[in-house]
Amino acid sequence: MKVILLDSIDKVGKIGSEIIVKSGYARNFLFPKSKAVLSTKKNLAIFKKQQHILKSNLDSKRLKAEFRAKAINDLGSITITVKSSIHGKLFGSIGSRDIAKLITESVGFEVHKSQIRLPNRDALKSIGEHNVCIHVYNEIYANLTVHILNSVLFQDKSKKS
């Protein structure tokens, strides 16, 4: 099925591209989310007229994304305290959902778990520093350091005082 993209989509195409996709992908994803329209002469003419509006919308989304990436980069790092073994292995793990929740609380805007890129595409399972990448928008990324500390150490120190 031939469609015209109304938004840039990773690994598919940029705004205004006329591409061929499977009909199920178009019907179930692109059309309901208003990311594409069926490629016809009439739709091509309408798209040409509205192209500058779509470009300005895309530019405003890009500016928002750059602002969000800067806010996350300015945050620099977040600290998580969890229980762990003597050897530094966590009882459980820290996943993208946990990190997204902490970032959302810290910066004041929503960061979805699907935007978090963990090292080795696996949950964090040990104490220490871990570098995490956040995919904010198409080619805009932010970097963050996650410090994982043992909560038992902090409780023992507070009991002795």
Swiss-Prot record:
Gene Ontology MF annotations: rRNA binding; structural constituent of ribosome
Gene3D superfamilies documented for this protein: Ribosomal protein L9, C-terminal domain (3.10.430.100), Ribosomal protein L9, N-terminal domain (3.40.5.10)
Signal peptide residues on this chain, from the entry's feature table: none
Cellular compartments per GO CC: ribonucleoprotein complex; ribosome
GO biological process: one example: translation
InterPro entries registered for this protein in UniProt: Ribosomal_bL9 (IPR000244), Ribosomal_bL9/RNase_H1_N (IPR009027), Ribosomal_bL9_bac/chp (IPR020594), Ribosomal_bL9_C (IPR020069), Ribosomal_bL9_C_sf (IPR036791), Ribosomal_bL9_N (IPR020070), Ribosomal_bL9_N_sf (IPR036935)
Keywords, sorted A to Z: Ribonucleoprotein, Ribosomal protein, RNA-binding, rRNA-binding
Function, in words: Binds to the 23S rRNA.
Family: Belongs to the bacterial ribosomal protein bL9 family.
Protein name: Large ribosomal subunit protein bL9
Species per Swiss-Prot/TrEMBL record: Blochmanniella floridana
